[in-house]
């Protein structure tokens, strides 16, 4: 390897919002990384799926555009 080409790695502490911390190496100089999810709290790794509220989106769409019936024309020709 060429000298002075690669960045220096620093020991870094990663802190998740769930409270989990672990140490790794990174090029970030201050040695602290904050993460939103980690393997201890991510639904894929824990097996707990979070249910997303899509009902609110449907209601918002129906308020904006109204509820259409099958066969009803939408708008007229200009």
Curated annotation (Swiss-Prot):
Pfam families linked to this entry: Ribosomal_L31
Entry-linked SUPFAM superfamilies: L28p-like (SSF143800)
GO cellular component: ribonucleoprotein complex; ribosome
Physiological role: Binds the 23S rRNA.
Record keywords: Metal-binding, Ribonucleoprotein, Ribosomal protein, RNA-binding, rRNA-binding, Zinc
Family: Belongs to the bacterial ribosomal protein bL31 family. Type A subfamily.
Complexes and interactors: Part of the 50S ribosomal subunit.
PANTHER family per record: 50S RIBOSOMAL PROTEIN L31, CHLOROPLASTIC, LARGE RIBOSOMAL SUBUNIT PROTEIN BL31C
Domain of life: Bacteria
Cofactor: Zn(2+)
A GO BP annotation: translation
The name this protein goes by in its record: Large ribosomal subunit protein bL31
Stored InterPro entries: Ribosomal_bL28/bL31-like_sf, Ribosomal_bL31, Ribosomal_bL31_A, Ribosomal_bL31_sf
GO molecular function: metal ion binding; rRNA binding; structural constituent of ribosome
Protein residues bound to Zn(2+): 16, 18, 38, 41
HAMAP family recorded: Ribosomal_bL31_1
Note on how the cofactor is bound: Binds 1 zinc ion per subunit.
Lineage, broadest ranks: Bacteria, Bacillati, Actinomycetota, Actinomycetes, Frankiales
Coiled-coil regions, chain positions: none
PROSITE patterns found in the cross-reference section: RIBOSOMAL_L31
């Amino acid at each position: 390897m060429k000298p002075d080409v690669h960045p220096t790695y620093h020991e870094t502490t990663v802190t998740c919002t769930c409270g989990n911390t672990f140490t790794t190496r990174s090029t970030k100089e201050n040695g602290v990384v904050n993460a939103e999810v980690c393997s201890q709290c991510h639904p894929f790794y824990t097996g707990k799926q979070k249910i997303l509220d899509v009902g609110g989106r449907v209601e918002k769409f129906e308020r904006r555009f109204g509820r259409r019936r099958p066969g009803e024309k939408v708008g007229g020709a200009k």
